Amino acid sequence: MASQRSDFAPDLYDFIESNDFGEDPLIRAASAAEEGFTQPAAPDLLYGSQNMFGVDDAPLSTPAVVIPPPSPTPEPRGGKAKRSPSAAGSGGPPTPAAAAQPASPAPSPAPGLAAMLKMVHSSVAPGNGRRATGSSSPGGGDAADPVALDSDTETCPGSPQPEFPSSASPGGGSPAPRVRSISISSSSSSSSSMDEDDQADGAGASSSSSSSSDDSDSDEGGEEETPRPRHSQNAAKTPSAAGSPGPSSGGDRPAAGAATPKSCRSGAASPGAPAPAPASAPAPSRPGGGLLPPGARILEYLEGVREANLAKTLERPEPPAGMASPPGRSPHRLPKDQRPKSALAGASKRKRANPRPIPQTQTQAPAEEAPQTAVWDLLDMNSSQATGAAAAAASAPAAASCAPGVYQREPLLTPSGDPWPGSDPPPMGRVRYGGTGDSRDGLWDDPEIVLAASRYAEAQAPVPVFVPEMGDSTKQYNALVRMVFESREAMSWLQNSKLSGQDQNLAQFCQKFIHAPRGHGSFITGSVANPLPHIGDAMAAGNALWALPHAAASVAMSRRYDRTQKSFILQSLRRAYADMAYPRDEAGRPDSLAAVAGYPAQAAAAAASQQQPEAPAPSVRVREAYTRVCAALGPRRKAAAAAAAPGTRAPRPSAFRLRELGDACVLACQAVFEALLRLRGGASAVPGLDPSEIPSPACPPEALCSNPAGLETAALSLYELRDLVERARLLGDSDPTHRLGSDELRLAVRAVLVVARTVAPLVRYNAEGARARASAWTVTQAVFSIPSLVGGMLGEAVSLLAPPTRSQQPSSSSPGGEPFSGSAAAEGSLQTLPPLWPTVPGKQSATVPSSHSQSPQHSQSGGGAGATTATCCRATQTNARSRGQQHQPQKARSPQAAASPAHLSQEAMPGSSSDDRAIHGRPRGKSGKRRSEPLEPAAQAGASASFSSSARGYDPSGPVDSPPAPKRRVATPGHQAPRALGPMPAEGPDRRGGFRRVPRGDCHTPRPSDAACAAYCPPELVAELIDNQLFPEAWRPALTFDPQALATIAARCSGPPARDGARFGELAASGPLRRRAAWMHQIPDPEDVKVVVLYSPLQDEDLLGGLPASRPGGSRREPLWSDLKGGLSALLAALGNRILTKRSHAWAGNWTGAPDVSALNAQGVLLLSTGDLAFTGCVEYLCLRLGSARRKLLVLDAVSTEDWPQDGPAISQYHIYMRAALTPRVACAVRWPRERHLSRAVLTSSTLFGPGLFARAEAAFARLYPDSAPLRLCRSSNVAYTVDTRAGERTRVPLAPREYRQRVLPDYDGCKDMRAQAEGLGFHDPDFEEGAAQSHRAANRWGLGAWLRPVYLACGRRGAGAVEPSELLIPELLSEFCRVALLEPDAEAEPLVLPITEAPRRRAPRVDWEPGFGSRSTSVLHMGATELCLPEPDDELEIDGAGDVELVVEHPGPSPGVAQALRRAPIKIEVVSDDEDGGDWCNPYLS
């Protein structure tokens, strides 16, 4: 009954009585009024905040304002609501406009509603106001309950009013205005007795004539109902419910608490309420059993109509999509005209579940109770996501009936079945941040956030930094879940994701404006890493899968687990969440529809698979192809070896088949790349072609020798990827099912990269040979030839490119030239792959006869499997420098071989190409024989030596060189030089012989091949080869550890025999051989060696130095400068604590003599190059000698992976081995030439050859040799250079000041030409030129050529690969420190290492000149520009003027005048091979 005001009531009654309206028109009018009700006005915040009142002055029959409850404690089922004593008389304050009037006494009740309405009309006062009251109790009434029913009780003036407390009324003398009671029920009230309560309520008695006190009493009485008392004088003696005597109520009107329904729960007792009757007492409709008055009947009909409309509303479908509020926004925060009308507003939970039927009409069956999963969604009106989940849960039975296999996702709730606390969206203008329910101000308008939101909208992968202002977190969560399941380095990315420049700026912005103002580092933020959204989004959505990235990131952040343990936890999380992320149906198949309905992370692939159930989607096929590639090339299990019979060896594939498969993989990679470029229109648009995403090989090169099937599977998978990419290009525009997204293309690129990096050693890191064997390229090369040859070459190409048919040649040879044998047939054919053609036009195809044993590359002669192993291992080496040392078939010298023209050409090798000359050999001289190549077996057929190839089945195709035929041999008649190397004797090697001594157990470096270990030189030949004054006697045993070195020495014995009975000629000690043997003169005694530094020199770099050929008398070629690869120059610069640039003295191109490393040798440091003679033997000899003496050798390896020699030294894990990268790019002047402020800074870390590595080595050295002098690896005194200065063409720098004065000053003694004297002494030259002292005053102070020391910045492993200076995030104070710092030359000073993440805690060191020595500023010339460095004044402490820096420190640092080096913090030593001293249990050198 809308708008029931006091002045309107008599008019309404008179209108009804005068027109004699029936019941039906009134019902229709009430129904229309019910369906067209309006929205409530805004709540009274003043009264509502007191938790005492509900809605103030709200019209009747309107829903209450929904306010979320503060999660009240659940009431025990069936328990009674507890009532607060203070709430018994709670009331509402009067309106401010109400006039002050004394309370009037309550008259007797009127006999009926009509009389009551007339009495209201006759006794209304003009000053009377009205008031909305509501009671609040812990158990029953809560003013903030979102599900409240308007229980409107209209009373007349003068009726019994509750006595309000003094705190309830603003004014003390205000009269009690007219009461309008609105009871609010708590969501935590008991629902177990709902049906019983409804039955006890009878036929829907109206609540308009009942007071809140009877509601409370009836609520406590279970099924009790208060009967209407008879109209007698005894009614005046009924005590009040509060226990206090109240005014008697006379007359024959019903009491103020008659027939109160349970839905009116206020928890307040009003005076004058009669005591509740027993539950069994009937409730007559009228005292005395008569009919109700006409007014009461009308009210009952209206109440029934209202409840019937509520029942219809519950059966209506969900509102249209347009009425729903947008995600993350409450509908009650919308403007009033845009708020959706809630059909359930104003109804209690009992009425929602069980609507009442219309009384005295057709009885309707009560609606079935709503599902339990949807109850919390109806209560949580502010969560649109929860409402959507509830709607899905409510429609679960219907969906299950039509699709029984559909996976039903249930939201994750609390154990009590309630939504998680804090699930409500944050208030307007705020976003989630911090603990449960906390939020912060939104920063949507900040430029950094705007740019980040645009990047997030376009990103396909998870963004490395996420903030709530960027948009909906669903996309980020799904991408993170995908990444956790698919990425190999998921935890590393979550903890330390690589940030670009923009993401780095965003991360700094978040740290400065979001995290820093809100607490310390352990402050609760709701997400443990930058990429993770707030956990509140997952809690609000009830999505358990979204907790997976949080769990993975939490484990990744923990320091309590190592890498292996974290990997186990990650795998456990993947298995635990697998069924949730990839649901399966009852048959165990992946249920794509369930993935769509449950978790949208797999929605795209599932939708495609549903559209094409007969064939997997392209994205699925891409993933399967990538999986097959990884499985085919991954580490092979030992099951095949275990299945073989005992005592038998598994058959190994031939070298020809391995080359065929390697070329097939190269062509497959090329085909995929071409398809990708055509699809995306360029390489820059292809995802995954990033240097940072290059994967590591799937298996070591040696594993490919026994896995030909894996190579074939990988090639076939790549061709399948090529087909998928082509379909996407041709059909993707018209058919969306063939399209490939960025994730699929990235996976395809990664599959190609995995194959390429794994197969690269097999093709010797060169794809030209495979390209020449492509059929289309062969024909193209033929048609583009010159006119005179185009016809013949095209015909030859067509004949050569005939389809290969192995079945036609069962006993002869294959199209590639390899004999077809049973083993080849067992290996399988390549008919499923595109054909590989043997050669290019213009070359004769090889036709090798059955006597193919003449070719050592493709046969198994005598040695059997050993020869095949040697060939296989040779084909899979990773050293590009040793390509020229590979053994290739050469021109046969026997008459039988010369009779066949095919044997005289290079094409005797199957599958050879025009590129083979560049790969396998060098241009030959007139004799047609390279000096470093061994003799062929045919040339030794008539030899009478004891090591002939036919004697013991020796295969000369081993990885070591035999003595080649000299160009000029002065040989006596009948003399034939023996072969230096032969097979290993059956009885075992002699201890004085030459062979490899490979230690037992595990090694830091790859173990040599079986063929290298099988090479042997007899002791009598060893003694003759090493007996030369070129080799110091103490180091001669090292030569016996290296058969390769012995073969090289034998190849240089080209002179006449040194004495009678000698088997070899006299050794010709040429310049290159002397340079390769110079290392033996560094340390005379091998016992004094404690540290070995391994490096790979650049071209023409060696320790002998010498004048370059550009100078008069020079014979040495000028070395090549490289900005990327470091050689001997970079090694000495790091050991000498100086910066390497192309113009500095440290570069080998500026040397005029040999560098002096005697200071390092005095400490026991041996510098060993991969090009030195017996490099492998020296390392293994030192390891064996020191290990036998129970000493550990400290090995520092600066050799890159691609430069590691073939069959390099095996270093046992008993010794200490440290590896680091050597590159000139550590100097900021080389890496970023334009950054002038960093020209004297050098980057360092534990992975770079520099102070970071040296600190680890010095600590290990101190543990190994506690009684020795400490190791000093980064000192200026370690290295001295021989360069051209004004003191001479070959001046050793730094030249001491005393020696400088002795050599330079006498030339100008008595010179009258002051200009010549100034120019000769360099008075006006810069003090330092390219870091070295140049002017006279600088040379007179520190020495000529003394260099400035750099400032080392500890950048960590990630900073070592920085491309731009901004990626290092250098603090401004540190950058200024590097600009003004000038570390004067000091031969014994330690390196100055500063952390790159902190501001320096000391003043920048300067150079100060005493008066009388010229200008106080120091001039430094670098890269053609001169810089003036001002000294540090003594009178100013903080700011010294231009060029200085203001330092802000917490603790006072050293005094400005003290030039002392910063003490470096202790660096953690992370050496895998470190062991306790004196432990011999793992020493492989002790028998």
From Swiss-Prot:
Family assignment from sequence similarity: Belongs to the herpesviridae ICP4 family.
Subcellular location: Host nucleus
InterPro entries hit by this protein: Herpes_ICP4_C (IPR005205), Herpes_ICP4_N (IPR005206)
Protein name: Major viral transcription factor
Acidic residues bias: start-end ranges: 214-224
Keywords for the protein's UniProt record, in alphabetical order: DNA-binding, Early protein, Host nucleus, Phosphoprotein, Transcription, Transcription regulation
Listed PANTHER family: LP07818P1, OS12G0136300 PROTEIN
Function per UniProt: This IE protein is a multifunctional protein capable of migrating to the nucleus, binding to DNA, trans-activating other viral genes, and autoregulating its own synthesis.
Biased composition regions of type Polar residues, renumbered to the chain: 878-893
Annotated Pro residues bias: 66-75, 273-285
Residue ranges with Basic residues bias: 920-929
Gene that this sequence comes from: IE
Domain of life: Viruses
Signal peptide segment: none
Region spans: Disordered: 41-295, 310-370, 803-1007
Biased composition annotated in UniProt, kind: Basic and acidic residues: 988-1007
Molecular function in Gene Ontology: DNA binding
Gene Ontology cellular component terms for the protein in this record: host cell nucleus
GO biological process: DNA-templated viral transcription; positive regulation of DNA-templated transcription
Compositional bias ranges of the Low complexity kind: 165-193, 201-213, 235-272, 807-829, 849-860, 867-877, 938-951
Pfam family, one: Herpes_ICP4_C
